[in-house]
Regions:
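Short, acidic, small-residue-rich periplasmic hinge/interaction motif at the N-terminus
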Residues: 21-57, 65, 465
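Extracytoplasmic beta-strand/coil segments of soluble accessory domains associated
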Residues: 66-114
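Outer-membrane beta-barrel signature, preferentially recognizing the C-terminal barrel domain
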Residues: 107, 252-275, 311, 366-368, ...
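Short strand-turn segments of transmembrane beta-barrel domains in outer membranes
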Residues: 156, 161-191, 202, 207-214
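Structural signature of Gram-negative outer-membrane beta-barrels, strongest in the C-terminal barrel
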Residues: 230, 327-331, 357-475, 508-512, ...
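Gram-negative outer-membrane beta-barrel transporters
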Residues: 380-383, 472-474, 491-563, 587-593, ...
Length: 627
């Protein structure tokens, strides 16, 4: 281990030793992730991090992902530029949790509890997750397949959308500009009048980025309408649409010419919810869809490609749950889900637009269905002891049925602290690409399966809160592309055995100063996973004085695996690097705020995706207006 991780841990230990004697009950967070009803985290056996809107907006980032990467131990998000992640070859935005990869569909992103992933490739589309829609983000570390099913194998990121709680009208406008021709802007309006509330927002951003032919442009909007029929019943409908255009230059040593992407993603959902003293529940319908058009480019600038890759996909479903307190200390949740997953991948001629006939499974269409039922029961046996158990039966139209159990216990030896133990199973059904698309595809694939064993401790004091997690992951049936005879084939031949530790702490020194830090240590016994660092540490400081707010964060990455061949195997390792980011906000008055951000202020030379060196120091500045 290098000296800088040790120094960051020493600072954490010194803070805990100095301030642990100040014991008082802090305001506890309530969450909806990992449990369908609103629940105090002290009674849940799993670990959930909450990143609120103030944290999401203090650095004026357009995406939620850079912020949650800093705030959540064990989470890594890949990047290749100042703005934009892109899709297809060379894309960034891959999300890793404890060495379990969202790029392989093993980590699930939700919007208001509804799954979001590409119906062809099974992975999240990271450019879709914009800050303007989010009231808060809840991140569950570890499997959550009992509640959410397939893909919630390594963890869950749940984006809880914004809503207005008090009567009134609020309008926010934010604009900014900075390095490499980067321009960002967004506007939102929230209204509540009696039983009706609404939220409408729009966003635009563009940049040239730091390499030639790496431009990125994005625009989109979000709409949410809600109505409270009675104090106990309400309904809402929301929609989110985003479109981005991206250019792709290839690796720095292997340039690609003419590569471009035109991507549209959308989400629509509607729900009816009930909330009584002893029971609460919801019935919702949802769909997320995509339209992709991609020019893969050419290694020879004089020989442009003659076709576009295109895809259409949709994930449409119905979700129902009802949670009830049957007697003192009890909570029973019953639920059922149905999902229809559609994917269509094909090529068209650039000149005529005609659909092309392609050999070797280069094109394909797939329809898959999943239906599931589940229950989760939580019981306080005594005031200091809670037991939790859940079970899901999930049936896939191709791979068959899968039983998913979880068990947990929470012991509260102090009114301000709890020990949690959790054993849970996660799984992932194979994607359309793995079963039907390209020569290695295999229609006989089975679900990937994973068991997670976890022990954690949380303690909340007057000004200090801290926690620690130990985990062990044992996964099998991992889908790998394997050499079989003279060709390659996707097989359930892989295994993952990861274990590690995570530490986190927050200390509010006084009204002006606050510190937060988190650290994760990961050991991968089988092989190193791409973009899963062996150590990730973060130390942040917030300073507020009158109208001035300053936020600074120092992130240290060690043992980051890189894939130099494109086969998904970490065959190289990036040297350790330290990133210093800072944001400054100055409130001129109650309406206008001036802001400035700096990233990689130490001008580090590093890469997260092999062949895509990151920019050195970059800057943004702008203004926020609140009416």
């Amino acid at each position: 281990m290098r000296i800088r991780p040790l120094l960051m841990l020493a600072a954490l230990a010194a803070s805990i030793a100095a301030f642990a004697q100040k014991d008082s009950v802090a305001l506890d967070e309530v969450v909806v992730t990992g449990t369908r009803n609103v629940t105090d985290v002290r009674y849940l056996p799993m670990t959930v991090n909450v990143i609120n809107r103030e944290q999401l907006t203090q650095n004026n980032a357009t995406s939620i992902l850079p912020t949650i990467m800093q705030q959540v131990p064990g989470m890594m998000v890949t990047s290749r530029s100042m703005l934009g992640y892109g899709v297809s070859t060379g894309a960034a935005g891959g999300i890793n949790m404890r060495g379990i990869s969202g790029g392989a569909g093993q980590l699930l992103v939700l919007i208001d509890g509804h799954p979001q992933y590409n119906g062809v490739y099974g992975h999240p589309i990271s450019d879709s997750y914009q800050t303007l829609m989010a009231e808060r983000v809840e991140v569950l570390r570890g499997p959550a397949s009992v509640i959410y099913g397939s893909n919630a194998m390594g963890g869950v990121i749940n984006i809880v959308t914004r809503k207005m709680l008090q009567d009134g009208v609020r309008t926010n406008v934010r604009v900014g500009a900075g390095s490499y021709g980067t321009v960002t802007g967004e506007a939102s309006n929230t209204v509540r009048k009696g039983k009706f509330s609404s939220m409408v927002a729009g966003q635009y951003s563009r940049t040239d980025n730091h390499r030639p032919n790496m431009g990125f442009e994005q625009y989109g909007g979000h709409l949410k309408l809600a109505y409270d029929f009675t104090p106990h019943w309400n309904a809402y409908i929301d929609a989110d649409i985003t479109h981005f255009n991206a250019s792709y230059p290839g690796q720095d040593v292997k340039p690609v010419y003419g590569a471009r992407q035109w991507i549209t993603r959308g989400v629509v959902s509607a729900a009816v919810e009930n909330n009584y003293e002893r029971t609460s529940g919801a019935l919702s319908i949802f769909t997320n869809f995509g339209r992709h058009k991609i020019d893969d480019g050419s290694a020879d600038a004089t020989k442009p490609t003659s076709r576009y890759f295109r895809s259409k996909d949709a994930l449409t479903g119905i979700s129902w749950y009802q949670s009830a307190r049957l007697f003192e200390g009890n909570r029973l949740t019953l639920g059922a889900d149905y999902q229809h997953i559609y994917g269509n991948a094909y090529y068209t001629d650039k000149t005529t637009g005609d659909i092309l006939v392609t050999p070797n499974k280069q094109s394909g269409r797939s329809y898959r269905n999943e239906v599931a039922g589940y229950f989760d029961v939580r019981q306080d046996l005594v005031g200091w002891l809670t037991l939790d158990a859940g079970l899901r039966l999930d049936h896939h139209s191709i791979t068959g049925s899968e039983w998913i159990p979880q068990f947990g216990v929470v012991v509260r030896p102090l009114s301000t602290g709890e020990v949690k133990a959790m054993v849970s199973k996660g799984f992932r059904n194979p994607t359309m690409r793995e079963m039907f698309l390209y020569p290695p595809s295999n229609e006989e694939l089975k679900p990937e399966r994973m068991w997670n064993y976890e022990l954690s401790w949380r303690h909340r004091l007057q000004k200090l809160s801290y926690g620690a997690n130990l985990f062990y992951i044992d996964a099998d049936n991992i889908i790998l592309t394997t050499q079989v005879g003279s060709g390659k084939k996707n097989l359930n031949s892989g295994r993952i055995r990861n274990y590690g530790a995570e530490l986190e702490a927050t200390y509010h020194i006084n009204d002006m100063w606050a510190l937060n830090t988190n650290h994760s240590f990961l050991k991968m016994k089988k092989q190193q996973v791409v973009a899963a660092p062996k150590y990730k540490g973060f130390l942040g400081a917030d300073f507020r004085l009158h109208r001035l707010a300053v936020n600074a964060g120092l992130q240290y990455i060690s043992g980051l695996g890189l894939d130099s061949t494109g086969d998904g195997i970490a065959d190289k390792q990036e040297k350790d690097f330290v990133l210093l980011n800072m944001s400054v906000n100055y409130h001129l008055n109650n309406i206008v705020t001036l802001w400035a951000n700096g990233e990689n202020l130490l001008a580090q030379r590093y890469q997260i995706n092999y062949g895509y060196p990151m920019p050195r120091a970059t800057f943004m500045a702008g203004v926020n207006v609140k009416l």
